[in-house]
């Protein structure tokens, strides 16, 4: 795991990269460059004071693609929980979500239990999507725009529902084929039938499978996963995500803080590090 470095470690690394420039510099010019170096270090730190290692920064800057979780990452809320509130079963659905995100419940089981609790119909789902536009996390639009400007592909990998994530992808300029999420299946009369169990994220370890799929089919050398939950950490496997960046701007989960390669609470931190 390429874990976060100390301030002193990264300070030394950045200092080495500028040694040749500073070695012949004196006076105010040298002071200016030292201030610039300190500014670079502050730019890539999270609000918790942790710095990424050189290796993590290198992967972040040279990655071919970045995959984002959606709920409590790209968007500030948990979409399934909000849908549960809409149909009147919000508290029960939220409890199941919390248990799953903290790693205490297999995701496939959690998905089935939440759908059963909501008993959502096609009509209700369509109404919800129309009445609830995406609530984006601060800085995510700027980050995605910069990733696109640098020629990096952006994917959304979510345990949420494709029908609810489609507007998110559209607004961020992410093509539909780069959305990997669950699909609610309805009967002909519009009543709930279940979910498509062929989707990657309908099962445990699905995010890892999704990343391995896009990495192999797209020929990516490096893929970064960004998310707030335990299922995002699972993407860091052989052939999967090279690093996982934990995001705590909406929900802070201690497992993610402890086990991610880099933990941030603001997307501006990632923008500044590109």
Please state what every model-predicted region is:
Residues 202-233:
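Conserved Lys-Pro-Asp/Glu-containing loop-to-beta segment of HAD-superfamily phosphomonoesterases
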Residues 176-210:
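Glycine/Thr-rich beta-alpha phosphate-binding loop at enzyme active sites
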Residues 158-159, 221-262:
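Acidic, Mg2+-coordinating phosphoryl-transfer loop and its flanking beta/alpha structural elements
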Residues 41-46:
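N-terminal mitochondrial targeting presequences
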Residues 181-186, 248-253, 268-270:
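Short, acidic/turn-prone active-site loops that include or flank metal/cofactor-
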Residues 37, 48-188:
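Alpha-helical substrate-recognition element adjacent to the catalytic core
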Residues 1-27:
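N-terminal chloroplast transit peptides
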């Amino acid at each position: 795991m390429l874990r976060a470095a100390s301030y002193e470690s990264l300070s030394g690394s950045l200092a080495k990269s500028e040694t040749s420039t500073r070695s012949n510099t004196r006076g105010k010019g040298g002071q200016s460059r030292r201030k610039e170096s300190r500014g670079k270090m502050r730019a890539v730190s999270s609000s918790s004071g942790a710095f990424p290692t050189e290796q993590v920064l290198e992967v972040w800057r040279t990655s071919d693609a970045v995959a984002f979780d959606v709920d409590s990452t790209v968007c500030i809320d948990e979409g399934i929980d909000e849908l549960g509130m809409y149909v009147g079963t919000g508290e029960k659905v939220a409890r199941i979500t919390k248990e799953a995100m903290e790693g205490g419940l297999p995701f496939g089981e959690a998905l089935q239990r939440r759908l059963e609790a909501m008993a959502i119909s096609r009509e209700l789902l369509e109404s919800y999507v129309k009445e609830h536009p995406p609530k984006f996390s601060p800085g995510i639009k700027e980050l995605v725009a910069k990733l696109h400007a640098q020629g990096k592909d952006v994917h959304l990998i979510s345990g949420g529902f494709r029908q609810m994530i489609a507007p998110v992808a559209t607004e961020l300029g992410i093509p539909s084929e780069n959305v990997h999420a669950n699909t609610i299946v309805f009967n002909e009369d519009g009543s709930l039938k279940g979910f498509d169990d062929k989707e990657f994220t309908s099962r445990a370890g699905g995010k890892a499978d999704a990343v391995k799929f896009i990495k192999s089919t797209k020929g990516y050398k490096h893929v970064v996963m960004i998310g707030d939950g335990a299922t995002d950490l699972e993407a860091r496997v052989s052939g999967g995500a090279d690093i996982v960046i934990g995001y705590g701007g909406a929900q802070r989960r201690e497992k993610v803080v402890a086990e991610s390669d880099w933990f941030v609470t603001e997307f501006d931190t990632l923008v500044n590090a590109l």
